[in-house]
């Protein structure tokens, strides 16, 4: 609970709506009403000054546009009645209406300022000009005789534009002034415009005279321009970066153009060289076509057969043909014999097939001795082809060391005793014997009768049974 509420409760006040506790001169608390100042758009608050300067009047005060127009209409109506010389009743009625409006508008600060304005028309004109914007007309410092007429036309257009602007600005203030003031203002404007026209005509005549005498006064004109240039205000020096300077940019452009010209010259030289090569090629082709015979048929005279003996060549051909026929027949017989052997071996049982291989082993014509491999030597398999051919190349020892295998790798450290050491294809292991964990002293590997019996009965692949399982056995297994 706040202090104000506690004080109100202590003083016996039951309701505090729209009132606050206040302490009087005697020190007693009492509830006093609070006057709430409502905000009204356009109304001057009580704490603001009633009169303000002419500069702040346009922003501080606000009067409804509709009321201002009605006031101007009433004033104009009163003036019209007075001019027409109406009856006394009309004058009294107009005077009464004007008096009522004046009484109603006495408190308007804008009307008070309007009445207090100076009566002098020149002061009024000066104030009006100060209120409105100023248009700075261009000044022609130097001009040639040819460009003077164009500049005069542009200046006249700007002058007319300024006159229009002043007329438009004056039309806004016409509503606030009486008809007599408006007529006086318009007469002044007309006289000023006439004076401007006369001045323009005088200036045109003077310009024509100056254009005629411009040739004789060229030297004087140059001196005047120099003096004017000296009197001109000096500009502040501005720093320009190196890459933005005109001289650097021009040099870069020249260098770029030079490079382009050199590239174009090289390209043109290449094109000329290609054109000359094409011309030479075409000329050579034309010469060959001229020397070439018209018929494309083969001429037997082109082949020299003076040293040949037809009978000897025929006998050699016959011998080659007989050998070819014999070789083809032997190849066909061998293929048929191999097919018969394959069919016969397929029809044999496993025991018969083993016995047949023991009695008739495969004959290797070019069988080579088995070589000895070094530590970490790369192994190459001989393969199963060309075993029945008599050739010295096929009988060579292919287990000999090559390239890096000539070196003894047993003297290397343990870390380096791997294949492709230091490469992406490096292996972790050296050989299978090194990784073998078989314990030959274990009783599982002892050659006892019980181990041999167990191995023959239960070891995988020891039973030679290759019977195809029947459907009944498969069902039982399922």
From Swiss-Prot:
Residues 1-276, 456-478 are annotated as: Disordered. Residues 229-478 are annotated as: Interaction with Prp38. InterPro entries: MFAP1, MFAP1_C. Residues 160-170 have a biased composition (Polar residues). Pfam families: MFAP1. Keywords: mRNA processing, mRNA splicing, Nucleus, Spliceosome. Residues 107-128, 197-212, 245-268 have a biased composition (Basic and acidic residues). One of its GO terms (cellular component) is protein-containing complex. It is found in: Nucleus. Residues 1-20 have a biased composition (Low complexity). Residues 53-62, 140-153, 171-181, 214-231 have a biased composition (Acidic residues). Component of the spliceosome B complex. Interacts (via C-terminus) with Prp38. Required for pre-mRNA splicing. Belongs to the MFAP1 family. This is Microfibrillar-associated protein 1. It comes from Drosophila melanogaster (Fruit fly). The lineage of its organism: Eukaryota, Metazoa, Ecdysozoa, Arthropoda, Hexapoda.
């Amino acid at each position: 609970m706040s202090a104000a509420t506690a004080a109100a409760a202590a003083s016996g006040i039951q309701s505090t709506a729209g009132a606050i506790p206040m302490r009087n001169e005697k020190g007693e608390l009492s509830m006093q009403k609070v006057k709430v100042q409502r905000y009204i758009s356009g109304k001057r608050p009580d704490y603001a000054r009633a009169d303000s300067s002419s500069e702040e009047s346009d922003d501080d005060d606000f009067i409804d546009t509709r009321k201002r127009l009605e006031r101007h209409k009433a004033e104009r109506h009163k003036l019209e009645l007075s001019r027409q010389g109406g009856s006394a009743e009309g004058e009294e009625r107009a005077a009464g209406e004007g008096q009522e409006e004046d009484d109603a508008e006495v408190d308007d600060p804008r009307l008070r300022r309007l009445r207090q304005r100076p009566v002098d028309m020149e002061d009024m004109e000066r104030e009006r000009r100060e209120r409105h914007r100023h248009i700075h007309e261009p000044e022609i410092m130097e001009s040639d005789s040819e460009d003077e007429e164009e500049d005069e036309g542009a200046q006249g257009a700007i002058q007319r534009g300024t006159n229009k602007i002043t007329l438009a600005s004056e039309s806004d203030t016409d509503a606030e002034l009486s008809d007599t003031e408006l007529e006086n203002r318009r007469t002044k404007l007309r006289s000023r415009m006439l004076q401007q026209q006369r001045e323009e005509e005088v200036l045109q005549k003077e310009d024509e005279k100056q254009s005629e005498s411009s040739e004789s006064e060229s030297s004087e004109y140059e001196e005047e321009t120099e003096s004017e240039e000296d009197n001109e205000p000096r500009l502040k020096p501005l720093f320009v970066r190196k890459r933005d300077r005109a001289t650097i940019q021009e040099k870069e452009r020249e260098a770029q153009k030079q490079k382009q010209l050199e590239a174009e010259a090289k390209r043109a030289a290449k094109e000329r060289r290609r054109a000359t090569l094409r011309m030479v090629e075409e000329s050579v082709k034309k010469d060959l076509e001229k020397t070439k015979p018209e018929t494309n048929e083969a001429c037997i005279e082109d082949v020299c057969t003076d040293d040949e003996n037809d009978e000897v060549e025929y006998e050699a051909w016959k011998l080659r043909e007989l050998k070819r026929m014999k070789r083809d027949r032997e190849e066909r017989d061998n293929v048929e014999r191999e097919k018969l052997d394959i069919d016969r071996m397929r029809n044999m049982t496993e025991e018969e097939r083993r016995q047949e291989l023991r009695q008739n082993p495969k004959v290797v014509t070019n069988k080579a001795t088995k070589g000895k491999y070094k530590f970490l030597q790369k192994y190459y398999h001989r393969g199963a082809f060309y075993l029945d051919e008599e050739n010295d190349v096929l009988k060579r020892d292919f287990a000999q060391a090559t390239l890096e295998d000539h070196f003894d790798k047993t003297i290397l450290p343990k870390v380096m005793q791997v294949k492709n050491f230091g490469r992406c294809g490096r292996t972790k292991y050296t050989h299978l014997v090194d990784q073998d964990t078989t314990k030959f002293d274990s009783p599982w590997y002892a050659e006892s009768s019980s181990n041999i019996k167990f191995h023959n009965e239960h070891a995988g692949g020891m039973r030679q049974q290759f019977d195809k399982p029947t459907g009944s056995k498969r069902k039982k297994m399922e």
